[in-house]
Amino acid sequence: MWRSYKAETPELADETQEVDLNLHDSSESDHEGRQSRSASITSSTSAPASNDVTLQVPITNSSATSPTPSTGSMYFIAGMFDGKEKVNREQPPMPTTDGVEYPRAASWAAGNCANVLNDDKGKQLFRVFLFQSLAEENLAFLEAMEKLKKMKISDEKVAYAKEILETYQGSINLSSSSMKSLRNAVASETLDMEEFAPAIKEVRRLLENDQFPRFRRSELYLEYLEELLPRSYAEKWAQSFEGLLGNHVGRHHFRIFLRSIHAEENLRFWEAVVEFRSSRHKANAMNNLGKVILSTYLAEGTTNEVFLPFGVRQVIERRIQDNQIDITLFDEAIKHVEQVLRNDPYVRFLQSSQYIDLLSKLK
């Protein structure tokens, strides 16, 4: 039976957060020295559905109509693909950990992008990540659109809309139809906000399906989490294999250890199946992801091959061929992989410098 892995939280049960383990991309460190063995499961059809996000953008008293967002306005450079301006980009400040406890920061990676965008410190950390990924214009565009919606004076609103178009049309990646709608909206004196909707939707989808998954697996986010992680959480991993897998930081350090003993593909497979199960309400996404998992981890001779008992892989292959794909497709395979990880690598990890050194750093 598949287990539900939860992150360690304070003793209050109602504060427990489900850990979202969707596997969309790996962090840069995950690829170091292991590019031939790491696999990234990405699929636009398997990505979580985009939800509307209410961006909490501070409203300034200034009458200026610059589309540069008030939060972080000193470092956003319009036309970021211009060489001179790109060199002059100034990194936004990292958010401090003051007033932030581990469960709050861990919740930023759960669910969808709204969780991080609706938290001031989470959004600032996400902003830093986007800056490092040369993609901060996407968040800045959404913030500018939120400010536009809140403006009341029509003349200022029209002028601001024109500046938004001038600022972002060369840097955000929009389809031709959405860009046309954006230009039509700006050209109209009535400023029908429905004309802006396609562009807003596409940028939100890009954040949700591409940049947010990268963020929650990034070194930047994991290091921030590790700074907040109480030692008591990490100590519990010695008694709970499930607790280790259900914790972002714990799973990250376990992955590094598994890489050192050439067994990382087992955890990658486990994470991919978690994502597969999370797509159970999207038939096409589940079908596509099931086939990707089969070819990436279970095909004979693949670099990331996970070895299963005789017959288990054949059953999976047959079910996929017969289009009998459901949430139980990988159940037997996961039981075996969990047992493999628990029997030897988990025990060795608890005795490793990777775990001991982490404990020594935590308070």
UniProtKB/Swiss-Prot annotation:
Keywords: Phosphoprotein, Repeat, Signal transduction inhibitor. May be phosphorylated and activated by egl-4. This is Regulator of G-protein signaling rgs-3. Pfam families: RGS. Disruption phenotype: RNAi-mediated knockdown in ASH sensory neurons results in hypersensitivity to dilute quinine. PANTHER family: DOUBLE HIT, ISOFORM B (PTHR10845:SF192), REGULATOR OF G PROTEIN SIGNALING (PTHR10845). Residues 21-35 have a biased composition (Basic and acidic residues). It comes from Caenorhabditis elegans. GO terms for biological process: chemosensory behavior; negative regulation of signal transduction; sensory perception of bitter taste.
